[in-house]
Amino acid sequence: NLLRSFHQEYPNILITCSRCDTDMLAAGLLNGDYDMIFTWDSTNILLEDQVCHRLVERVPLIVALYAGHPLSGRHTLNRMELKGEQILYMSPSGVGDSFGDSHFMELYRKAGYQPDILFRSSDAESILMMVAAEEGISILPAYVTNKLKDADNLVFVPLVGEEEYEEIIAVWKSDNAGQALQKFVLRIRGAE
């Protein structure tokens, strides 16, 4: 774990974590509220001249289903097999019409259909509660469900396909000369 190993090496540097949607994270970074953010680029922040970034992780996507769903016994699914399902859509953004949303809508288009989106939110917990209540299914990044064991009425099936992943990137302002940030950036570059 990158954060843990950095903290162990530099225990006097406080790493604080905030969980927000991608729009708030990007705005916070550009406004100087954060030294660095870990995000998926749904805001197109990488087009900003004043930022640097590194790929941290490529996370596979999974399909969250309720236990009684006809597809819940499958070992893998592809996006085409989800046609006609009511989708509880986890948006990377609070605005619902972001660069990231456009990317995922394009994946549905390539699969041959427009998704039937029943609900849209950037809050994974709300979406999982609705899936467990059998209101629909959802596609989520695997990090949302990796630690869930014995989740009541939830089944997670890997989504297969060439583009069925999410890239997590570390982003920081190039003009931030803070010593702690520079040490962390070196750690990230060393992890490549």
Summary of predicted features, one role per range:
Residues V155-E192:
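A late-sequence structural motif
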Residues Q50-L61, L65-I87, Q182:
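Flexible hinge/capping segments at coil-to-helix
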Residues W40-E48, S102, L107-K110, A124-L154:
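A ligand-binding cleft/hinge motif common to bilobed small-molecule-binding domains
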Residues W40, E85-A111, G178-Q182:
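Secondary-structure junction motif
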Residues L2-P11, D33, S98-Q114:
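Ligand-binding cleft/hinge of the Venus flytrap
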Residues N1-L46, S121:
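Central regulatory/effector-binding core of bacterial HTH transcription factors
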Residues G28-L30, L82, M129-E135, A170:
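Hydrophobic residues within well-ordered alpha-helices
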Residues V51-I62, A142-T145, D150-E164:
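Short beta-strand->loop
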